């Protein structure tokens, strides 16, 4: 099944309706015996640092003018719900990227089984340029994937990464043409669908971090993020 998440993780994590809609779709897929794999197809363009900064500031406003820590709680809850479903899927899940991914989506796809991109794909990490710490999801999964030293180097020196650079780092499984992308992703999903479901689930549990570990990182990261936002407001 192909899903094209408009506005990606950012909307799913911060918008309750969008989150519930995505969780409902994934729940339906999970309960279907006819669907053999999930392709999350990313085709949107990055709208620039000004638009992204506005999103960060709106996040701060929602935290200030609502119950204390609401944004932090909402973010952590949405991430945990989404990752829990991914971990327990009995079918493979892959990302097909033919556009731009912001920091949260970049981090999130590292939890998928496969990531296939085109030469047009770019991954953005503008937080430090804007005066904020890295995305909680991106900093966590990048560190897990590459180790703390390499992750630190990338987060501090790279605000934009090409698909070729991501492939060389081992973050992308394969690079294909735009015309080949969807079919290649579906082909790889069909290959992985031959793995018994219980073995697939247990493999993820062995290789993926625990949700408690992720939650602790999210709390620490978001506290630092909010401190920076408050300081820039004052």
Give the role of each language-model region.
Residues 1-43:
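Conserved CoA-thioester-binding segment of acyl-CoA-metabolizing enzymes
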């Amino acid at each position: 099944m192909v899903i094209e998440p408009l506005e990606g993780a950012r909307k799913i994590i911060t918008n309750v309706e969008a989150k519930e809609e995505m969780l409902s779709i994934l729940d339906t897929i999970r309960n279907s015996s006819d669907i053999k794999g999930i392709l999350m197809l990313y085709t949107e363009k990055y709208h620039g640092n000004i638009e992204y900064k506005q999103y960060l500031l709106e996040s701060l406003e929602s935290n200030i003018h609502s119950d204390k820590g609401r944004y932090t709680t909402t973010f952590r809850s949405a991430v945990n719900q989404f990752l829990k479903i991914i971990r327990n899927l009995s079918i493979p899940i892959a990302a097909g990227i033919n556009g731009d991914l912001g920091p949260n989506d970049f981090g999130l796809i590292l939890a998928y089984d496969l990531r296939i991109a085109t030469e047009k794909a770019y991954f953005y990490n503008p937080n430090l340029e804007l005066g904020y710490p890295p995305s909680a999801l991106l900093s966590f999964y990048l560190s897990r994937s590459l180790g703390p030293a390499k992750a630190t180097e990338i987060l501090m020196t790279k605000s934009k990464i090409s698909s070729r650079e991501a492939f060389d780092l081992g973050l992308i499984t394969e690079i294909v043409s735009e015309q080949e992308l969807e079919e290649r992703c579906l082909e790889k999903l069909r290959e992985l669908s031959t793995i018994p479901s219980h073995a697939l689930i247990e493999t993820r549990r062995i290789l993926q971090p625990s949700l408690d570990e992720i939650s602790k990182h999210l709390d620490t990261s978001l506290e630092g993020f909010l401190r920076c936002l408050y300081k820039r407001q004052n």
